[in-house]
């Protein structure tokens, strides 16, 4: 164990398994040797036996562990119930006196004077719900700039532009940002990919006993998010208004954003409609995929493409509660596109992602630069992938090194020297950018 691991108690390999129930960390459980990477079990509860799933999030844990090696302060953000607290307890071992939860009144009192509370501590100091402590980051700057630094800091917070802004401003050069999304196919295994697509990646939704229970949990999540969480993040917009806006955006999933159309539907000004979109984007429940502009002498689209980041939430906003309803819904293809895109985003982070589209409707679902070369991805829910005229335009205009058509099949095969059809299962179980590039050759 090196000096930093000794200092902050990092576990070089996962030693225990998080028990995820309703998004809360209930403890850890050493599995028997025969237990696979994820397994269903039941544990006793005071009033009922609760089904749970043990999920080891190796990729997210490794990413957080690397960040804690590099930076004196790590800010772990993500949507509510994504598993931030669970992950932090799995990766780092903070002593009880070095663990704070700002939602806990006792800990909030301890942190009323952050300098007094933190200056005498050593090792890994974990602070949860940090968005509730506006004076924290200037104090952290003083603490990490001490000649001898006996501590490192893991800061957890729900998605908040103010939180990220304060951290970036006060701790420039001292903080690394890590975003935790929902569960990935690599977390749950390819055999559970369809369930992950239907239910989404929030652990309580994915691990629910049934689709009905999962849908009910997501309904409650949406209500709580709109009525409480947004207000806590500083968004002062009525819950009913934001529900209408979010539902409208669900119907635009996978399409270009039209501020005029959303404003007309909500009977508000375009600037107000844009404010609603930005609020949901800042809360990490909506993705705005920005356009890539190539110097090609053609008019190109400038509006972002809109995706509801968690497909489980998308499906509830659209009234979809099971696989049959999903298969019959006209947003089936767009839903699958968004699911694959979010899985790729988790793999490719922190590389910026773009889409590309001209006024003549030549388009590319995803554009990214890797190792200094441009790559494109087309996400097609078809059994017979082929090269379209639009793809040929993208290859020429964007000078792509490779274009991958991601489809729900079983076989990888080339369609030309620069275009390859790749099964989604192979793409989504890739563990690194290097593995992905090897797959595209």
Swiss-Prot record:
<feature type="binding site">
    <location>
        <begin position="78"/>
        <end position="85"/>
    </location>
    <ligand>
        <name>ATP</name>
    </ligand>
</feature>
<protein>
    <recommendedName>
        <fullName>Uncharacterized protein Mb2031c</fullName>
    </recommendedName>
</protein>
<dbReference type="GO" id="GO:0005524">
    <property type="term" value="F:ATP binding"/>
</dbReference>
<dbReference type="InterPro" id="IPR041682">
    <property type="entry name" value="AAA_14"/>
</dbReference>
<keyword id="KW-0067">ATP-binding</keyword>
<keyword id="KW-0547">Nucleotide-binding</keyword>
<dbReference type="Pfam" id="PF13173">
    <property type="entry name" value="AAA_14"/>
</dbReference>
<dbReference type="InterPro" id="IPR025420">
    <property type="entry name" value="DUF4143"/>
</dbReference>
<dbReference type="Pfam" id="PF13635">
    <property type="entry name" value="DUF4143"/>
</dbReference>
<dbReference type="InterPro" id="IPR027417">
    <property type="entry name" value="P-loop_NTPase"/>
</dbReference>
């Amino acid at each position: 164990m090196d000096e930093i691991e000794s200092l902050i108690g990092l576990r070089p390999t996962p030693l225990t398994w998080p028990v995820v129930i309703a998004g809360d960390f209930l403890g850890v459980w050493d599995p028997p040797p025969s237990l696979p990477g994820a397994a269903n079990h039941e544990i006793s509860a005071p009033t009922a036996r609760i089904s749970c799933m043990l999920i080891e999030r190796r990729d997210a844990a490794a990413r957080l562990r690397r960040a804690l090696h590099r930076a004196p302060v790590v800010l772990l953000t993500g949507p509510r119930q994504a598993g931030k607290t669970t992950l932090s307890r799995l990766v780092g071992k903070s002593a009880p006196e070095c663990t704070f939860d700002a939602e806990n009144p006792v800990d909030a009192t301890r942190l009323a004077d952050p300098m007094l509370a933190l200056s005498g501590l050593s090792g890994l100091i974990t602070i949860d719900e940090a968005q509730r402590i506006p004076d924290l980051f200037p104090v952290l700057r003083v603490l990490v700039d001490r000649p001898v630094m006996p501590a490192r800091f893991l800061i957890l917070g729900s998605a908040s532009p103010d939180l990220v802004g304060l951290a970036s401003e006060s701790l420039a050069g001292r903080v690394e940002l890590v975003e935790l999304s929902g569960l990935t196919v690599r977390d749950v295994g390819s055999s559970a990919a369809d369930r992950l697509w239907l239910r989404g990646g929030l652990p309580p939704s994915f691990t629910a006993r049934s689709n009905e229970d999962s849908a009910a949990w997501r309904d409650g999540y949406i209500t709580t998010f709109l009525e409480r969480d947004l207000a806590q993040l500083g968004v002062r917009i009525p819950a009913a208004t934001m529900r209408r806006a979010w539902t409208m955006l669900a119907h635009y999933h996978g399409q270009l954003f039209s501020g005029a159309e959303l404003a007309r539907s909500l009977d508000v000004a375009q600037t107000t409609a844009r404010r609603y979109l930005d609020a949901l984007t800042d809360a990490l429940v909506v993705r705005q995929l920005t356009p890539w502009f190539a110097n090609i002498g053609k008019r190109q689209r400038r509006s972002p493409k809109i995706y509801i980041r968690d497909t489980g939430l998308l499906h509830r906003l659209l009234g979809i509660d099971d696989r049959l309803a999903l298969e019959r819904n006209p947003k089936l293809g767009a839903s699958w596109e968004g699911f694959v895109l979010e899985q790729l985003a988790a793999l490719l982070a922190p590389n910026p992602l773009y889409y590309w589209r001209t006024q003549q409707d030549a388009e590319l679902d995803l554009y990214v630069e890797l190792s200094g070369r441009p790559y494109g991805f087309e996400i097609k829910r078809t059994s017979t992938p082929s090269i379209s005229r639009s793809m040929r335009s993208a290859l020429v205009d964007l000078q792509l090194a490779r274009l991958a058509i991601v489809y729900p099949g079983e076989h990888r095969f080339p369609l030309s020297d620069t275009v390859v059809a790749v099964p989604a299962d192979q793409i989504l179980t890739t563990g690194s950018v290097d593995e992905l590039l090897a797959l595209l050759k």
